[in-house]
């Protein structure tokens, strides 16, 4: 079988009939019985995104990350020092075993969450299907792109994603954006084989008659023959040879920043602890083991699992709310947006446009205007938008009562068309009636129709389009716009030659016959949704290509501030600095081109905003790409769905509000873990540094630090499912390493103060009371003193770490004003009780733990209570000073 390149070259060189015969197809498409044969012969239209990871690889990736690599190195060093280099009979692998167990538990939980996440993502991706229109057995069918086979004849129009590598059989003003393959930002015009001026066989990407999978139709229409599918396509070849690089999201960048910050801090603290203990005790081997254990205590090894669990849980919940997350990390970015830019149509309005009035130039009802509009909408083969459908629907209703609009599809047939594009903002069809008269009918934005018309028609008379008539038309249309009606102009020219080759230059010297007034009423949910988004700290800005008067009328009805509207023509004269100021004070932008929309979003981002963009059209794709979060709907054109990070199954701002809230919950619970864990761990390290300087022995055995870290991490498993205060959800939040360092600096030392208080009580009161004497270095009872002391701080550390979770998880009073999830209560209580019971369990001798007296537990209760009260007091000061919590 020929290679994909040979197939493409052959199609350019040989007669079309030869190509059709080779693939056993016809101009009217494949026969149904030939489809499966071609699929078996040439393969499926699916690009392999790299081989699916094996279970072994997934397990490896779940376990190995910067934090666990550090832990495994520590485990190895501990094994060498405590087992390999230990004296006979003194081998103790406990620390190494516990560290490895810690890594396996963290990795195992993450692996399970990743599997759940992958399954959820797979289920969600099946909800979003891109389709293509093919000819089979002579009739048009819309099928999923992955069902296309070599030999299929496909119909392409503006907004479509080209579904395979194809050769063009027929085309009209066909422009394709293929920057993803060539890097060329400008759209490229393509032509069918019969019209192409030669073919470039050296660089197939530059061929006029070939179009490639994954590129997008910007304007025009074409019929094409599928030559290459799936992995054999140009895009498939690229996917197989390079690793696709995705620009990290703001969330990913901040998480990487935080991870390396913690690693750097650990790399500083471990040597400091090692040197101090080595100089104090003189036992450098024991000091090394202890310093490594401190490293374990500083490592938030559950962070990857917490992130995965939070994102997976968020995506599943959001799917139930009709929000499909294409990229998991987009969940947090969605929650962080403070500005939502959106088009007007279908978002603020019902997306069910009704043609209210077909009017002549003086504003009187005129069915001849409807007649010509129908010819334009019915016979055009591009993307029939909502206004086309409204025109056809109104004509079908009127045809039951009026002969002038009856059987038009039988009375006329199409000769040619000039497809819509965003530069001209109009489209034309050339039709011939049964009497042989040929005419061009054009509809489009009124300003553009006036620019190509030199005459107007009124009650059958053709008169010049004078300035007075133009002013009358504009005044009439302005009144309609102020009522919220969208207006299109309709012009025509007749007595054309059907054998002519028509182009956009023929759209001139036309007769304006009238205009069409459409009603697209606001959604009942639009005003409440905009208000709700505002309550969550999100400003809604409207970016539309529509008329400013219509936009103003609709925006006023939904409660948006429209005291000032910025037009696309204004943007063209503004510098970047002027635009940066204007975007802050302007809510509504009208008559925009796609590039102007993207420029506004980039300006907002440069001003420090997190911007989401919601759209569903071809012209929305550039804006979605440059925004922080691209949002589309399942009914959008292919290019919009392909570009989006988030897809709504219901085009409603209320649905988006639910997704935004869930994104903030994900952020909140991940932030809780990071801030609470790191501040608590650093508090312990400061305590250890103090103890290393002033105590004649280690305050906690290395194995105690490891167990403490293991149990604490298990207690944090429920944090992704914790409740989040409603007040916290009202504002957008972004990740800041500076905020984490500030949090550590405020709350780490509080933990140290009460640890030191515990040292004093244990050293001078509790342990001497239990043993009947104080610490005597080198005495036989010194070992017992150390074990009891270490047991006391071991238990106090666990209680302080778990109970402070409830103090720090919310700025409010715990259990009274803010209630944690039951799972958080259960896991934290279990961790504290479990560690408290260890000295009385069979593990006591292995872990070198001892019983404690009743006075200890009374003082423990007092210390933990004072600690929680102190944290609450400092929390109040912190919030007052920095106006933030998590």
Question: What are the residue ranges of the model-derived segments?
Answer:
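Acidic, divalent-metal-coordinating active-site segment for phosphoryl/phosphodiester hydrolysis
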Residues: 527-529, 535, 547-558, 595-603, ...
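Cytosolic catalytic regions of ATP/NTP-dependent phosphoryl-transfer enzymes
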Residues: 210-218, 333-511, 518, 531, ...
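Membrane-embedded transport module
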Residues: 273, 304, 311, 558, ...
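Hydrophobic alpha-helical transmembrane segments
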Residues: 95-129, 136, 246-339, 516, ...
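Alpha-helical transmembrane segments of multi-pass membrane proteins
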Residues: 64-84, 100-110, 129-130, 260-278, ...
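Non-lumenal N-terminal regulatory segments of integral membrane proteins
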Residues: 1-140, 146-149, 154-162, 167-248, ...
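Soluble-to-membrane junctions at the N-terminal ends of transmembrane alpha-helices
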Residues: 44-76, 118, 140-141, 201-210, ...
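Helix-interface capping motifs at the ends of transmembrane segments in multi-pass membrane proteins
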Residues: 73-98, 261-299, 312-322, 501, ...
């Amino acid at each position: 079988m020929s290679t994909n390149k040979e197939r493409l070259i052959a199609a350019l060189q040989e007669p079309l009939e030869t190509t059709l015969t080779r693939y056993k197809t016809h101009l009217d498409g494949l026969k149904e019985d030939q489809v499966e044969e071609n699929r078996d012969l040439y393969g499926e239209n699916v690009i392999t995104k790299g081989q699916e990871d094996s279970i072994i690889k997934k397990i490896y990736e779940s376990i190995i990350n910067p934090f666990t690599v550090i832990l495994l190195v520590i485990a190895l060093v501990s094994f060498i020092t405590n087992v390999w280099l230990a004296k006979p009979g003194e081998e103790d692998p406990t620390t190494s075993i516990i560290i490895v167990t810690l890594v396996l538990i963290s990795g195992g939980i993450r692996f399970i969450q990743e599997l759940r996440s992958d399954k959820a993502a797979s289920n969600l991706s099946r909800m979003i299907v891109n389709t293509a229109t093919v000819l089979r057995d002579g009739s048009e069918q819309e099928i999923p792109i992955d069902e296309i086979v070599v030999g299929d004849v496909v119909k392409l129009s503006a907004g479509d994603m080209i579904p395979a590598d194809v050769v063009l059989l027929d085309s009209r003003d066909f422009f394709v954006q293929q920057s993803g393959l060539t890097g060329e930002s400008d759209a490229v015009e393509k032509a069918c084989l019969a019209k192409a001026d030669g073919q470039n066989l050296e660089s197939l990407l530059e061929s006029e008659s070939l179009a490639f999978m994954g590129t997008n139709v910007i304007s025009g229409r074409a019929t094409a023959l599928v030559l290459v599918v799936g992995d054999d396509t140009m895009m498939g070849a690229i996917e197989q040879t390079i690793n696709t690089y995705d620009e990290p999201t703001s969330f990913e960048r901040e998480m990487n920043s935080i991870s390396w910050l913690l690693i750097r801090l650990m790399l500083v603290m471990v040597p400091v602890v090692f040197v101090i203990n080595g100089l104090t005790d003189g036992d450098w081997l024991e000091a090394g083991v202890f310093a490594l254990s401190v490293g374990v205590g500083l490592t938030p090894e559950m962070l990857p699992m917490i992130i995965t669990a939070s994102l997976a849980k968020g995506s599943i919940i959001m799917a139930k709310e009709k929000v499909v997350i294409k990229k998991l990390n987009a969940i947090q970015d969605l929650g962080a947006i403070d500005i939502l830019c959106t088009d007007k149509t279908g978002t603020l309005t019902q997306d069910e446009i009704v043609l209210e009035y077909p009017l002549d130039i003086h504003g009187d009802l005129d069915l001849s205007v409807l007649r010509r509009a129908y010819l334009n909408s019915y016979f055009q083969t591009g993307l029939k938008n909502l206004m086309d459908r409204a025109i056809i629907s109104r004509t079908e209703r009127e045809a039951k009562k009026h002969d002038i609009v009856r059987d038009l599809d039988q009375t006329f047939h199409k000769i040619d068309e000039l497809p819509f594009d965003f530069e001209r903002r109009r489209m034309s069809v050339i039709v011939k009636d049964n009497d042989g008269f040929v005419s061009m009918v054009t509809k489009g934005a009124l300003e553009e129709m006036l620019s190509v018309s030199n005459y107007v028609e009124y009650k059958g008379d053709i008169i010049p389009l004078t300035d007075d008539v133009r002013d009358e038309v504009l005044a009439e249309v302005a009144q309609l716009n102020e009522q919220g009606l969208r207006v299109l102009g309709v012009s025509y020219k007749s007595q054309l030659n059907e054998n002519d080759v028509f182009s956009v230059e023929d759209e001139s010297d036309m007769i304006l016959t009238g205009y069409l007034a459409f009603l697209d009423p606001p959604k009942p949910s639009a005003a409440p949704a905009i208000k709700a988004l505002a309550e969550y700290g999100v400003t809604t800005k409207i970016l539309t290509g529509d008329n400013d008067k219509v936009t103003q009328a609709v925006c006023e009805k939904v409660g948006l501030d429209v005291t000032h509207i910025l037009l696309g023509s204004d943007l063209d004269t503004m510098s970047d600095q002027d635009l940066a100021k204007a975007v802050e004070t302007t809510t509504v932008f009208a008559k925009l081109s796609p590039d102007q929309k993207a420029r506004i979003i980039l300006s907002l981002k440069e001003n420090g905003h997190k911007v989401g963009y919601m759209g569903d059209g071809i012209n929305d794709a550039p804006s979605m790409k440059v925004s922080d979060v691209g949002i589309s709907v399942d009914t959008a054109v292919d290019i919009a769905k392909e570009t989006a990070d988030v897809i709504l199954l219901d085009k409603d701002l209320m649905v988006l509000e639910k997704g935004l809230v869930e994104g903030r919950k994900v952020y909140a619970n991940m932030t809780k873990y990071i801030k609470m864990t790191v501040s608590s761990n650093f508090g312990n390290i400061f305590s250890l540094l103090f103890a290393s300087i002033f105590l004649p022995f280690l305050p906690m055995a290395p194995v105690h630090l490891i167990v403490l870290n293991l149990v604490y991490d298990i207690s944090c498993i429920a944090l992704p499912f914790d409740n989040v205060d409603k007040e916290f959800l009202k504002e957008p939040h972004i990740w800041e390493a500076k905020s984490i360092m500030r949090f550590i600096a405020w709350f780490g030392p509080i933990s140290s103060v009460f640890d030191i208080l515990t040292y004093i009580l244990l050293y001078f009161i509790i342990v001497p009371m239990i043993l009947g004497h104080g610490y005597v270095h080198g005495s036989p009872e010194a070992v017992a003193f150390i074990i009891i002391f270490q047991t006391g701080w071991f238990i106090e550390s666990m209680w302080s770490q778990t109970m402070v979770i409830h103090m720090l998880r919310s700025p409010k009073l715990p259990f009274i004003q803010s209630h944690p999830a039951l799972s958080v209560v259960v896991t934290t209580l279990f961790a504290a009780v479990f560690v408290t019971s260890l000295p009385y369990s069979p593990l006591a001798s292995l872990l070198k733990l001892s019983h404690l007296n009743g006075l200890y537990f009374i003082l423990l209760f007092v210390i933990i209570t004072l600690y929680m009260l102190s944290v609450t007091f400092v929390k109040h000061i912190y919030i007052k000073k920095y106006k933030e919590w998590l």
